[in-house]
């Protein structure tokens, strides 16, 4: 077994796929601090403009949100102490779920420890070997893992290909229980799903629709998500979203009708068998949610800025795929090239993610740039760095 592990690790290194943790001292804010090894036992801490974090609205630095989190620690301590169904529940949790359901305009909601835990619970609880789940090929790994754990028939349709989805639904039309699952914003491409067509097919074939709004929550639809932006929120059965991205905190929610939420509370293993979130996190989630409700225009400001940056990158000759959101891929192709580009941009003071297979398909390695509301005053510096990258021919 150890020889097998060593062989696999060597293969990762040879293919520029070996991953290590960056020496980051602070990584959520406007600037990211990274410890650089200078050799001979010497290190240097450098500061970069943070274009890699999912803290899209910069809410982690909003004083009223930080104060709410700190107050909860002082009042309730640092841990919940148990799972929700034992003693890990408290009033802040109940308020967060009530406010979340009101915000999402659903009957009820349930808070989970992470988006991964939420998707694993949803699919493993609702689907079984008699269920057919139709899933976009670029859906997040948590959706895929939830489907696999459920034992359901996992039927993947080509990314955003409605004709392929329709053909597969027709082929499997006799399946009694059917689910269509999709991200609304795809995390590595920054494009959006064809939700109206998906909903119409789901209704025609009697399928349940589940959407993952992780990268749309807080931004689209006055912060409510892409389904609300498209005016389809009442035609979607289950909405999942996170507090760990635009809301600047941690954890996730599922919003749906009361029966579905009651069922997940009783059958969602990742919910039942996890210690609940600590008071500091729940209070931050609640404060962030209220902040977005009161500042619902900030998502549109972010999208307008991202649109301007994307158009300028395209003018330079960069391939940004089908992005129409705050996530902008710069597709370079090979693993080696994308790693070189990342290092080049770091020399210019810009930190972006270098995304390689298996996260993205082979030969589509890319820089993943996430536009953030709190870095817009640095836009020209960012664009100048990309102009220099293009001129360098990397």
Report each predicted region and the residues it spans.
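Conserved PLP-anchoring active-site segment centered on the Schiff-base-forming lysine
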Residues: 122-141
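N-terminal "arm"/small-domain region of PLP-dependent enzymes with the aminotransferase-like
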Residues: 2, 6, 13-76, 207
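Active-site C-terminal subdomain of aminotransferase-like
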Residues: 205-208, 215, 219-324
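PLP-dependent enzyme catalytic core of the Aspartate aminotransferase-like
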Residues: 63, 67-71, 75, 98, ...
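Active-site phosphate-binding strand-loop segment of PLP-dependent enzymes
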Residues: 55, 155, 159-211
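Conserved PLP-binding catalytic core of the aspartate aminotransferase-like
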Residues: 300-307, 314-349, 363-364, 371-373
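Conserved N-terminal alpha-helix of the aminotransferase class I/II PLP-enzyme fold
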Residues: 66-114, 306
């Amino acid at each position: 077994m150890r020889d097998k592990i060593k062989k696999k690790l060597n293969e990762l290194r040879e293919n520029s796929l070996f991953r290590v943790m960056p020496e980051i001292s602070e990584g959520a804010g406007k600037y990211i601090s990274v410890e650089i090894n200078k050799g001979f036992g010497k290190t240097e801490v450098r500061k970069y403009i943070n274009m890699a974090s999912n803290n899209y609205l910069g809410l982690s630095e909003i004083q009223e949100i930080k104060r709410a989190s700190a107050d909860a620690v002082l009042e309730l301590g640092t841990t919940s102490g148990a799972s929700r169904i034992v003693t890990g529940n408290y009033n802040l949790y109940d308020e967060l779920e009530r406010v979340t359901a009101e915000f999402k305009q659903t009957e009820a909601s349930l808070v989970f420890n992470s988006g991964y835990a939420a998707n694993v619970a949803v699919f493993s609880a609702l689907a079984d070997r008699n269920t057919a789940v139709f899933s976009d090929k670029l859906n997040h790994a948590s959706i895929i893992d939830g489907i696999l754990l459920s034992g359901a028939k996992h039927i993947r349709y080509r990314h955003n290909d409605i004709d392929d989805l329709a053909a597969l639904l027709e082929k499997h039309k006799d399946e009694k229980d059917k689910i269509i699952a999709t991200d609304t914003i795809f995390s590595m491409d920054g494009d959006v799903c064809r939700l109206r067509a998906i909903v119409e097919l789901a209704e025609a074939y009697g399928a349940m629709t589940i959407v993952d709004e992780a990268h749309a929550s807080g931004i689209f639809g006055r912060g409510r998500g892409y389904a609300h932006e498209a005016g389809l929120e009442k035609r979607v059965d289950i909405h999942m979203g996170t507090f760990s991205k635009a809301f600047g905190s941690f954890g996730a929610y599922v919003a749906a009708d009361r029966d579905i939420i009651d069922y997940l509370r009783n059958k969602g293993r990742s919910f039942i068998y996890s210690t609940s979130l600590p008071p500091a996190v729940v209070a931050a989630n609640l404060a962030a949610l209220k902040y977005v409700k009161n500042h619902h225009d900030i998502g549109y400001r972010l999208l307008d800025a991202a649109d301007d940056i994307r158009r300028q990158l395209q003018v330079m000759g960069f391939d940004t795929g089908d992005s129409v959101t705050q996530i902008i891929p710069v597709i370079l192709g090979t693993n080696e090239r994308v790693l070189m580009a990342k290092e080049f941009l770091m020399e210019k003071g810009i930190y972006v993610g270098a995304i390689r297979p298996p996260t993205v398909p082979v030969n589509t390695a890319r820089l993943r740039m996430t536009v953030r509301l709190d870095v817009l005053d640095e836009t020209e510096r960012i664009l100048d760095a990309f102009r220099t990258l293009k001129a360098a021919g990397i």
